[in-house]
Each structure stands twice: as C-alpha cells, then as structure tokens.
Amino acid sequence: EIASCLVGSEMCIRDRDCVVIGFDGEQLKVLLINRIGEENGKVYRDMKLPGSLIYMDEDLDEAAQRVLFELTGIRNVNLMQFKAFGSKNRTSNPKDVHWLERAMQSKVERIVTIAYLSMVKIDRALDKNLDEFQACWVALKDIKTLAFDHNLIIKEALTYIRQFVEFNPSMLFDLLPRKFTASQLRILFELVYDKAVDVRNFHKKIALMDYVVPLEEKQTGVAHRAARYYKFDRKIYNKTRR
C-alpha cells in the first residue's frame, strides 16, 4: 500500500528522492536514473533522481534506503534528510503528471517529496541488471532538464552541502579515495564552492588540518612531478571536534 492522503478531493502522494553525489577526481557527478514514458502516442526517455513512493509500513529512512537499492543497486549508504519539497507547481508539467498517474493508476493533484542526500565514493558498484532504470553518473555541468523539480532539488542539495561542511568538513572526505593528492582535495573544494582556490593558500590550509595526514607514498607513472598522497584520519578529526 502506497502512502497517500486526500486533501478535499485531491490526492497527495508522499515521495522520496535521493541526491547521491560522487567525485571522479575532476568533476562532481550526480547519480541519475532513466525514466520511460509516453506522450502523444510516442515513447520518450529522460532522466530523474532515484526516487519512488513510500509504503505505509516503512518509515522515512527505511524508504530512502529501499528506493535507492531497488533503483540503483547501491545499499548501506549514509542518507540524510535535507529538505521537503511540496510546491503546488511540482505537478504543473503535464508530462510529469501523466507519467505519475500512469504509475499510480490514479489521478494525482499534489506530490510531496522528502529529499535525501548522500556523498559516496564514485567507485560504488551500480546494478547493471536493472535495465529499466539504467542508473548512471552524470557530471553536474552536463545535467539537462530533469523530471519534476529535480534540477531544483540538486541545486538545494549543493547549497546544503556548502552550509554543512562549514562546521563538518569530514563530509567532503566521503567523496575522496582512501589516499588522495592535495590537488584532488583542492579541486573538490573548488567544485563544491563553485569558485577558484589559490593553490599556495590552499596548501597552507591543508597544513592546518591535523586530520589530513601526509603519507610517504607519492604518485607513480605520471608525466608531471609526482605529488604526495594524503589520507583523512577520522580519529584525529573526531578529537579536534570535541
């Protein structure tokens, strides 16, 4: 049974959408899935955030984990609620309404979604057997118009990240590999804050981060000067936050 409610004669659907962000060393990427629909007798394909409806017998967090696994194959990730989206204009696009009503087999006037955010290492395996959804990573700069208000949800997720890392920067290290270079970390900061970072000043900033630990290991097989690797030490980080 799907969670829904009647407001007057209108049906309101409760939904979960997940913004999953990864970093490939050069670009921020968002996990999207395929949407197949029919409009004016023609089949179309576009993209949307992984999301679906909540069942009556599950709580919000359970629904988010289930939805993400069923649509992408990713499980056991840290998902956090960051905002609810319930504008009446969410169902202003006839294409979206028609797709939703076919899926629900019922007339829908309103849809409210609780958005979840997760930042993961981009090498997480996606389930390629889920042919219908074809989950894939798309560079943030390459994302086109998505279903419903999903472009807005992604924009709000980035705003939330910028605010959150001001007092909890450990969130960013969830995107990095176990060992990373100062350049990778700097590029990540630039992408998150959408502004250039001075290289020299950034190295000074790293030196002040006790939890960013330099390793003896350096890059190999590179044409340029080999860069030193660093690692994020969560134990040291937790001590500095007390």
PLM region spans:
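Single conserved hydrophobic/aromatic residue that forms the stacking wall/gate
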Residues: 1-13
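Short helix-coil junctions and helix-kink-helix linkers
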Residues: 187-196
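Short beta-strand scaffold segments in enzyme catalytic cores
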Residues: 16-20, 116
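Phosphate-/nucleic-acid-contacting segments
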Residues: 197-200, 207-223, 227
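Long, intrinsically disordered, low-complexity Ser/Thr/Pro-rich regulatory/activation regions
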Residues: 112, 216-242
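Conserved Nudix-box catalytic region and its N-terminal flanking loop in Nudix hydrolases
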Residues: 27-75, 82-88, 163-187
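NUDIX/MutT-family hydrolases
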Residues: 11, 113-122, 126-163, 176-183, ...
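Active-site segment of metal-dependent pyrophosphate-handling enzymes
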Residues: 62-65, 69-124, 164-170, 210-213
